[in-house]
Structures are given as structure tokens and as C-alpha cells.
């Protein structure tokens, strides 16, 4: 079993981006769990839109990471090239947060479920805020990368940060194809039959419609059996 972002899962299955020419197809979807939002965080008041990132120092995640490709997708939707239009920095979440705190970068791409602790801290201590995407560019992004969903981060998620429109990918459980069908069935059943007793904040986002909504990688037979019992037909190999 493993936990992945839906976009990275698609890269692996299709042999694209960081898996270019090396497809991995011996796994299946178990369930989608919750959304992980692409959050563009900045403390620079001159940055109002993604277009304003041109000429700025921007952390776009570790090279080859899921965040890196999310950043490239969004920059590309706005006609920006990460090699020529921005001063790209390749930092993970923690280093990006530290660099924003110290004023060493202008903005950072963070892909994680909101609220994210690092952004909460920056919003409180530095007045950081999030950059919104506009519908026109979201639509262009979804044409080439259908695993993105439009997502609105509500006002109040972070102190002083207004409602922000962005895109999100899914956090997904996957399993090797050779994992026993009954074991996978029991895992999915245990999660969704006991969702009300789960302590993590993200548990409130568990939803069968969402869990059964993955289309880019087929479902494991054990998961498909559980969803069929609940009235959902999902693709299998």
C-alpha cells in the first residue's frame, strides 16, 4: 500500500514527467481520500496574480517532485517558463517557509491539505497570503491535466487571508495488484464504515462519491467490490 497524489499516480501509470519512459502499471487505486490544494503563498504585496511572479524569486519544490510539476503546470497555464521567467528555487516545504520568513524568496508553491501548518505560521507572523487562480487559466490547465479540480479555500482558513480560488489534486491510497482482494476490501470497508470515529481533521472530508471518483488509474478488485456494494461502479483492469 502507499499514499500518493493523484497527479503523480497518473505520471507513474502513463510513464510521463518524472516517470518519462518508465511506466509503472502493477498497482491499482484503492480510494481517494481528500483534496491537497496547490497553495501559492507570498508575503510580497506586489504579487496579486500568478502573472506577477514573472521576474520574482519563487520556490517551486524539489526538482522532479510532485510540487515541481504542479508549479510547472500552473506557470505554463499563465504562459510563464520556470527557466526563463522566474528565478526558480528548488526547496521543500520547510525550507520554503524559512526562506519566506527570512525574505529570501518572493513566493512558494505548497501542495498540501489546507490549513497547512507552515502557512498558518506565516500568515500569523508575516501577514502572508495566497495567490488566486482565475477560471480562464484553470480551464486551460484542466484541458491538458484533467486530474486537477477547482477548489476554493474559504476565508478564515488562515488568519487574515480572504477566500482563495486555486486547484487541487487528490490524496489517494494505492495497492500493488497482487495484494489479496479480501485484504483491500477490508481496508476500504474499515476506513469508510468508521469515518465518524477517525480523529484527524481530514476525516471529515471522507466521502464515497469522491473516493470512487478516480478515473485515471483503475481500481483494485477489492476496492471495486466495496464500492459496488455502496452503489458505485468503478473502473477495474
Please report, for each region that a protein language model flagged, where it lies by residue:
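Short, glycine-/small- and polar/acidic-enriched structural segments
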Residues: 1-54, 62
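Stable alpha-helical elements in mature extracytoplasmic
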Residues: 5, 9, 26, 49, ...
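Pocket-lining segment of extracytoplasmic ligand-binding domains
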Residues: 6-8, 15-17, 82-174
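Solvent-exposed loop/turn segments at secondary-structure junctions
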Residues: 7-11, 36-37, 46-48, 60, ...
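Extracytoplasmic
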Residues: 24-27, 35-37, 55, 83, ...
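Bilobed "Venus flytrap"/periplasmic-binding protein-like clamshell domains
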Residues: 35-102, 213-222
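Ligand-binding clefts/hinges and TM-proximal coupling segments of bilobed small-molecule sensing domains
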Residues: 56-57, 63-73, 147-218
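An extracytoplasmic/periplasmic, membrane-proximal ligand-sensing/linker region
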Residues: 95, 102, 112-125, 130, ...
Amino acid at each position: 500500500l502507499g499514499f500518493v497524489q493523484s497527479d503523480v499516480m497518473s505520471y507513474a501509470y502513463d510513464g510521463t514527467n518524472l516517470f518519462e519512459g518508465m511506466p509503472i502499471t502493477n498497482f491499482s487505486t484503492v480510494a481517494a481520500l481528500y483534496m491537497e490544494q496547490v497553495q501559492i503563498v507570498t508575503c510580497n504585496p506586489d504579487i496579486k496574480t500568478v502573472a506577477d511572479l514573472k521576474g520574482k524569486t519563487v520556490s517551486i519544490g524539489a526538482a522532479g517532485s510532485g510540487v515541481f510539476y504542479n508549479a510547472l503546470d500552473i506557470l505554463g497555464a499563465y504562459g510563464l517558463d520556470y527557466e526563463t521567467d522566474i528565478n526558480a528555487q528548488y526547496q521543500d516545504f520547510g525550507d520554503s517557509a524559512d526562506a519566506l520568513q527570512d525574505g529570501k524568496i518572493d513566493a512558494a508553491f505548497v501542495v498540501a491539505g489546507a490549513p497547512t501548518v507552515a502557512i498558518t505560521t506565516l500568515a500569523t507572523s508575516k501577514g502572508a497570503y495566497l495567490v488566486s487562480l482565475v477560471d480562464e487559466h484553470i480551464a486551460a490547465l484542466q484541458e491538458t491535466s484533467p486530474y486537477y479540480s477547482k477548489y476554493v479555500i474559504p476565508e478564515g482558513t488562515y488568519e487574515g487571508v480572504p477566500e482563495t480560488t486555486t486547484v487541487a489534486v487528490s490524496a489517494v491510497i494505492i495497492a500493488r495488484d497482487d495484494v489479496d482482494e479480501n485484504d483491500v476490501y477490508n481496508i476500504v470497508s474499515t476506513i469508510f464504515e468508521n469515518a465518524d470515529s477517525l480523529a484527524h481533521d481530514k476525516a471529515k472530508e471522507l466521502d464515497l462519491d469522491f473516493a470512487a471518483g478516480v478515473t485515471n488509474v483503475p481500481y483494485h478488485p477489492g476496492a471495486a467490490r466495496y464500492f459496488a456494494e455502496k452503489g458505485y461502479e468503478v473502473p477495474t483492469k
